Amino acid sequence: MSSWSMVKHRTLALVSAVATACTAATPVLAQTPGQKPNIILLVSDDTGWGDLGVYGGGEGRGAPTPNLDRMAREGMQFWDFYGQPSCTPGRAAMQTGRLPNRSGMTTVAAPGQGGGLPKGEVTVADVLKSAGYSTFFVGKWHLGEAGYAMPTAHGYDQMKDVLLYHLNAYTYGDPQSNPDWPPSIPKPVLIGELEGVAGQPYKEVRKIGVADIPTLDDGIETASRTYINAHAGDRTPFFMSINFTKNHQPTLPAPEFAGKSQVKTKYGDSVVELDTRVGRILDTIRQAGIANNTLVFYTVDNGAWQDVYPDSGWTPFRGTKGTDMEGGSRVPAIAWWPGHISPGGTSWDICGGLDLIATFAAVAGTSLPTKDREGKPTTFDSYDLSPVLFGTGKSKRNFWIYQTEDELAPGAIRVGKFKAVFNLRGDYPPFSDESHTGWRGPERYVATVPRLYDLQSDPGEHYDIFMTNWTEKSWTMPVFDAVMKQVLESYEKFPPREAQSLSYTGPIRLSQYQRLEALRQRLQSLQRGSAAAD
């Protein structure tokens, strides 16, 4: 076989594999004998991939994480797990199992914008509730302010200590944080901490200010442990979505954790706090005697926010929160279920928060719906990970889509070990002191061909190998094109919802308006001509 034939054969094989993986992500039901397990999703905020000891951080970086490290030793650790590039998209992806632009949850939900998770979106709570689960949400929601967007409007029976914003939003009106706030500009009106039950009006329990930030996770931990103890003996299984505020900027540790890290920084102390609270929740599960019937999954919403260093997590990857580079969305993930997940397991499967809804559905013995909450056809971007968890097989996913803000076409695509990067916004070399990172960087795309990285041998994305002499890999383009085609075609059948959070990023040019107006008039003319012909 000629060298060209070999390349062609290899390309066709990869394209075929992509086409198979990109088809409907229907979960294969997990074989979990006996009673349906309780399921607990633990999510921390902006925690760095390298903050945990099992990922190279922990004590070596001055902030030990013995409880999360133990969780990994007793369960399974994921190496190629992805969130999304920022908070709201990351949380929407975990709750819905859909690319954020499908739900319209593409960027950070800001105070005063209203709106939020659309009424029609199906959540993991909806799916598990239909399978007979009691459902409980506690902590950071960040999926909008509207009543129709609340957890109790999306499948959760009960919600406690609910926070609607990114943590730094609670500093906006604080005179110490913003002493130069002009009196002529009204201070933002933030909705405070909420609680409620499904079918009844929710209520604001208290307002939240800077002074409350250090102890928010204390309330989240307490509510979580109280719920576990109250429902441990139930015949009905429960699903809990527990969402900590640590380690989002500003990281202000609770008083009991001040100075407890070896590094003696607020961020380090907050890492110790997060780890301790996770450990206490796991201890509560053990003490309640339900560890063998409870799946616990820990992960993070997005990559570390390097823009706000030193008040940020650490990552060995290129880029930061808000970018399509690995640092924007590669996150730690650990699954724990004694007696079902073998201790010390590791996975290099490509997977992410998108896959949790299909995985939890499979574990619960149910499947994902074909219609949304409004009765319209829907699709999911979620792949069942239960074969990976239980050692019976691999995930059907072999690709990942990277999108920032309102990108419709992917800003980067990973297939197998190769990653093509098209969107270079906010990019900077690892460990540089470049200030224009993340959201602050200029929007820019590659001219003709993408950057190409081998993430297996170069996870830090140092070496673009697309057109280098010795490792030339331009033959991979049909592979990425196949994924791009599949994603774009899916929008025709399942159109994305209206974006829920919009703000001006500029520029809007007169020439753009004129081109759009000319196109609109041309389309109207064609429609009139078609009608006349009929």
Model-identified regions with their sequence ranges:
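N-terminal secretory signal peptides that target proteins for export/translocation
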Residues: 1-9
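Bacterial N-terminal signal peptides
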Residues: 12-27
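Formylglycine-dependent sulfatase
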Residues: 14, 29-450, 459-482, 486-496, ...
